[in-house]
């Protein structure tokens, strides 16, 4: 298949590899993005790609807690300017309170719910769109629960660009739970611990690391041992409890949580716009479009 400049750009953003290396990888793998990433890693050219590191939309994340329930949501706008608008921020808080109180199962169900004065949630959002003048989208939300013996940790980074809610079992130390949430915001683990990683993902990583070691010219008899050592680093990158704690790198997150008498039950991390492709206008075209719109 034809390898486009956009494909090369995307692979560069995902791996940090050079343009020609990315083009070669895509050509060798017939345009398959995931296989091209593996190709670059096996050659030692790129690190593992982060699946959700492309922040391309605007908006806010927000967390609402009440008793033993917490809600995290993401509300998208088209521009950062609107995300800082008081009306948009008020809408975010209103929606969070409504969703936590009414507990819809899906975004579709949430939009169809009655809000106030006979209007639905979707109609309420549409009224805000009319006032603010920009498309606003309720992208996602999740409700988590705990018991009286547990603690929520809620953390919003950069005014809501990243939101994290954690649940610690066996302790009511909210400060500790928030510290873990801050760590999750900064390091972005995928899983709580190694047990949560699928056998398929581990085997895939083992194969990539094995090929990488062989390509480095390592003797076959020591490759297996090397791979197991590198797998340990792989787990440290993706598993929360295996990571060095950001507030005290001399201890693991597991040790920090255990020192508080708790265990991590779960976490949810939202970064605004992750995984969303934003249309990129040529600046000159954008200006012309605005001029035409004013005629």
Swiss-Prot record:
PANTHER family: ELONGATION FACTOR TS, ELONGATION FACTOR TS, MITOCHONDRIAL. GO terms for cellular component: cytoplasm. One of its GO terms (molecular function) is translation elongation factor activity. Residues 79-82 are annotated as: Involved in Mg(2+) ion dislocation from EF-Tu. This is Elongation factor Ts. It is found in: Cytoplasm. The keyword Isomerase does not apply. Associates with the EF-Tu.GDP complex and induces the exchange of GDP to GTP. It remains bound to the aminoacyl-tRNA.EF-Tu.GTP complex up to the GTP hydrolysis stage on the ribosome. Gene3D superfamilies: 1.10.286.20, DNA helicase RuvA subunit, C-terminal domain, Elongation factor Ts, dimerisation domain. Belongs to the EF-Ts family. Its main location: cytoplasm. HAMAP family: EF_Ts (MF_00050). Pfam families: EF_TS (PF00889). Keywords: Cytoplasm, Elongation factor, Protein biosynthesis. InterPro entries: EF-Ts_dimer_sf, Transl_elong_EFTs/EF1B, Transl_elong_EFTs/EF1B_dimer, Transl_elong_Ts_CS, UBA-like_sf. CDD domains: UBA_EF-Ts.
